[in-house]
Amino acid sequence: MEKNVKKEAWLHFCVSSIGGFMGAYAIINHCDLLASSQTSNMIHIVHNLFEPEHSLLIYMVLAALVYACGNVTYVLLHKFIKLDTKIISLGLTSVAFILVSVLNFVENSYLAMLPLFFAAPIQWNDYAGDAGYGSSTIFSTNNIRQTVTSLTSYLIDGDIKMKRKAQFFGMTLLFFHIGVALASVAEIFWARESIWLGFLPLAVSAVCCMWYKEVKVFSFGKKSEALESIVEEQVNI
């Protein structure tokens, strides 16, 4: 069991590099638009209601709806598809990268980023409870909080569980920003076409996923109730 948890943790770290790449690519190449999150978009929606010009409002709402559809799709996949959803998530992300490359000619950044608005929440949901921790692979706020609070608790109390928790969230942050660095360097040379470099962390994650699953594509069991309870307690948005 311990070995499997370690494998799941490494899978989580690798997938976090995809999340970092997606977030950085969107921000750098599409007017600071973060396709991995809806916080800024929802703020812009409300703010736009009080502006005299509403030309972008429909695109903002569309982005929010597509993001919501990504969450709905995750639930449907999780409940009705026998294939392992972690693998499906990576497949959908690869399709999203291809669609983004096609839509790059569109001047409207909201339209160009719609595939990432859809794929990001599916990845988030699929990898949120890895190794028993409620950690997101697509943005960093909660991961920073968990790293700092866990490390502080460990330094005060010497609790080894807090040390392991800080290590997990810290490694997630490290790999996330490896993805950010990849997107940043790629943009220098290929601008918007740098989306194709996203297949590098995707390929690494796919190999890690197969290693974790021991090359079994079909899922034959569920997480233990104990692990589910841990995830339920720690997942926060």
What are these model-derived regions, one by one?
Residues 2-237:
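Alpha-helical transmembrane segments of multi-pass membrane proteins
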